[in-house]
From Swiss-Prot:
Family: Belongs to the MraZ family.
The species this protein was found in: Geotalea uraniireducens (strain Rf4) (Geobacter uraniireducens)
Name under which the protein is recorded: Transcriptional regulator MraZ
Coiled coil (UniProt feature): none
Signal peptide interval: none
Amino acid sequence: MFRGKFETTIDVKGRTSLPAKFRDVLFETFGDERFFITNSNPVRLGEGVYSSGLVVYPYKEWLALEEKLMVGTGLGLSSAELAAVKRRIVAPAIECVADKLGRVLVPPHLRKSAVLEREILFVGMLNKAEIWSQAEWEKVCRQDEQNFPIDSPVLAELGL
């Protein structure tokens, strides 16, 4: 599973390095070096203010997601909402394989939507990973502090 937070950089051409631990997870846990990068769901930071990163989906996880979106039933989304999800998540997605040095190219349309400039983070989220600009990550973490389910029985049951 993807765990941890890794600070790195992205150059002006969109080249960055997938953390070695994440490359290992792709192959050892998910059995494939291929992955997809796409937009994440927007995170609401306030009235009319949203932040967004990118998501790295292992190949098999992405195919399973596509299948669910293709069928569309049982998701609890209207046809307009489902179309919006497909436009935001599926349309911009790119299939990737890191080179022998772990480098990957993030295309301009994804860099722009996630406001990726120089300092970026790869964040493990168990079955997927996220890519954030340092500034956007800090905003989302502040929001997470407000949204954290303090005294949640569910968290207590999990041992957290």
